[in-house]
Design a protein with these regions (language model features):
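N-terminal hydrophobic targeting signals that begin at the initiator methionine
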Residues: 1-3
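Bacterial N-terminal signal peptides
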Residues: 5-18
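Noncatalytic, solvent-exposed loop/strand surfaces
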Residues: 19-487, 553-590
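Extracytoplasmic/periplasmic, Sec-exported soluble proteins
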Residues: 58, 176, 488, 492, ...
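Primarily EF-hand calcium-binding motifs
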Residues: 490-504, 518-529
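Acidic Ca2+-chelating loop motifs
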Residues: 502-513, 528-538
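Generic alpha-helical secondary-structure signal
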Residues: 516, 540-541
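Short, composition-biased linear "edge" segments at structural boundaries
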Residues: 519, 544-545
Length: 590
């Protein structure tokens, strides 16, 4: 009887180690949905002096997001190299960090450091999001936490910081040298890692030992930076679903083999993650790629049988979030609302009052919106949080800042136990309702509906979207107007800038330089390391660039013309930058 009671207590103890409903254990929280199970009491307003519970200093920046399990928050960072363009330092000094912070006090409980596995891709000078040094969000199963550091591998620690194992998943480089950013997820006894840049692979690792259980290689992973999601098909089947370049894939998470695929959006890159509603999955991509809804399940090519709708709504880097029958996505300072039943655009709201983060506000939309109860929270790159009340029409409640200092926010916030956690380039912040009155910096909401003027049917794209076709940079050729001046012709810097600025937002990003053979030299014009080149930076630096003989392009860029890009977008058999010849898709399950 006594022995039986001990086993009962032990079983209960082990059960409590699992992730609770109010935890935020992975990128975008429970099931990767971006929807908080708890946290209803998270305040709608705060300031650096009100409703700020604590802030914790971080050892360096990162584009990863925080997670919260129990009373502990975890976040990854990097230091030692690539912090500034003027003085990047020595790559041998690059270190990744996993930091654990007490959720009650903000005290750092422990920090684990991982030295870079060399050779590592060098800092490009265009910002933290362009190299992947700390872009993957860790995942926790309630017992251990697993962090992916690109070429430096996957590392497992217990919740007290004890290192358990490390596993390599690849040491290759994607042609753009951007690195990967897909975050690991956990399933049964496995950690599943998408090593798109490191080995064009999806890898299943044993959570207890780090042993590789399966690996599927596919060059179709090139140009994919989103995180896969687990979709329950029925009681006996769960699919691992991801959006890659121009396709949706449904894999068997037990072995990585492909169960089904569907033609998806027109984008040659997939930055954001899918969202789901039961078995129905939604993907929204950028670069004029559009959006799609597909019912997961089946086998083989399910494009004709399972596609529910296609639409013109587009994203940039942030992933969409679903609430009831609506999808919400933020791109370039505009919040778009999409009907989940039809794919039609319901509303477009321009976010007003936002501050610039080096470049134009709205361009650095890396954080994804989240849902807490009946409110939508969106954090921009300058650390301003827009809070909306959800309903038939969106109503902006507040616009908040957590710091007056100049810090950059690239991670998606986490919500757990009535607390909201944000990471910046310097600190981890925790906001909770302390009963303090806040004079919110609210901004009026501009209704910028374009439902009548913008085509939203299949194949349409919203006004201002990038035109498709062989002439644009993503097809492999240089963007129109982006070639170097020919001999004997007058050189107009703004004409060149306008040709590179495909989305006409007044800035040139790394994505817009993709396929341009001068990309690496043009990136040096980004003097403030904000991930984009402004008109001022371009006009100031371009003449000097040409006078130094800058017309010779990078060997990583496309050769120009009809689709000769070497960036390895993973679609249509592009050059793989001397990588092994791999299949386009994972092995099909029989």
């Amino acid at each position: 009887m006594y022995r039986q009671s001990i086993f009962t207590v032990l079983a209960l103890f082990l059960f409590t180690l699992s992730v609770s409903a109010e935890d935020w254990p992975r990128f975008r929280g429970p099931k990767g949905s971006g929807v908080a199970s708890g946290g209803i009491a998270v305040p709608s307003s705060w300031s650096p002096k009100a409703n700020l519970s604590w802030k914790a200093e971080l050892p360096g920046p990162g584009a990863s997001s925080p997670i919260v399990v129990g009373n502990k928050a975890f976040v990854t960072c990097y230091s030692g190299y690539g912090l500034t363009q003027e003085n990047p330092g020595e790559i041998e000094n690059l270190i990744r960090h996993l930091v654990c912070v007490d959720m009650t006090t903000g005290k750092k409980l422990w920090q684990q450091d991982v030295k870079a596995a060399l050779p590592e891709d060098p800092y490009s000078g265009i910002g933290v999001t362009a190299h992947g040094y700390a872009s993957h969000t860790p995942v926790c199963d309630g017992k251990n936490v697993y962090a992916f550091f690109g070429k430096s591998g996957v590392h497992a620690f217990d919740l007290d910081g004890k290192k358990l194992w490390a596993a390599e998943v690849g040491n290759e480089s994607d042609p753009t040298k951007w690195g990967s950013s897909s975050s690991p997820i956990e399933y049964k006894n496995m950690v599943i890692v998408t090593a798109s840049a490191e080995s064009q692979s999806i890898v299943g690792l044993d959570k207890a030992t780090g042993k590789e259980l399966w690996r599927q290689e596919a060059k179709g992973l090139d140009g994919m930076w989103g995180t896969p999601s687990l979709v329950k098909i029925d009681d006996d089947r769960t699919d691992l679903v991801m959006c890659v370049a121009k396709e949706l894939w449904g894999l068997n998470p037990n072995n990585g083999k492909m169960r089904w695929m569907a033609d998806a959006t027109g984008a040659a890159q997939s930055y954001s993650s899918i969202v789901q509603d039961g078995k129905r999955v939604f993907a929204i991509t950028g670069r004029g790629g559009g959006s799609i809804a597909v019912d997961a399940g089946g086998s083989g090519n399910v494009s004709k049988t399972n596609t529910v709708w296609t639409g013109g709504a587009t994203a940039s880097f942030a992933s969409p979030v679903r609430h009831e029958s609506k999808l919400y996505v933020v791109a370039r300072g505009i919040l778009t609302v999409v009907d989940t039943e039809t794919g039609e655009q319901i509303d477009r709201i321009r976010l007003k009052g936002g501050e610039q983060t080096g470049g134009r506000f709205g361009s650095l939309d890396y954080p994804s919106p989240i849902i807490v109860g009946d409110r939508l929270f969106y954090l921009n790159g300058s650390g301003q949080m827009y809070v909306f009340e959800l309903g038939e029409k969106l109503k902006q409640i507040s616009l908040n800042k957590v710091t007056a200092d100049k810090e950059v926010f690239w991670g998606t916030p986490a919500v757990s136990n009535d607390k909201l956690v944000m990471r910046s380039s310097k600190h981890l912040y925790c906001v909770s309702d302390k009963g303090q009155e806040v004079e919110a910096d609210s901004a009026d909401v501009e209704d910028n509906s374009e439902s009548e003027s913008s085509p939203q049917s299949a194949g349409g794209r919203p006004s201002g979207g990038r035109p498709t076709g062989g002439g644009s940079g993503f097809g492999g050729g240089r963007p129109s107007g982006g070639s170097r001046p020919a001999g004997g012709q007058s050189f107009d810097p703004m004409s060149m800038f306008n040709g590179l600025d495909a989305d006409k937002d007044g800035n040139v990003t790394a994505a817009e330089l993709s396929g341009n053979r001068m990309a690496e030299r043009l990136k040096t014009l980004d003097k403030n390391s904000d991930d984009m080149i402004s008109k001022e930076e371009f006009s100031t630096g371009i003449s000097a660039l040409f006078s130094r003989g800058g017309s010779g392009g990078s060997s990583r860029g496309g050769a120009g013309g009809g689709g000769g890009s070497s960036r390895g977008g993973g679609y249509g058999g592009r050059s793989q930058d001397n990588r092994p010849d791999r299949p386009q898709r994972p092995e099909m399950e029989k």
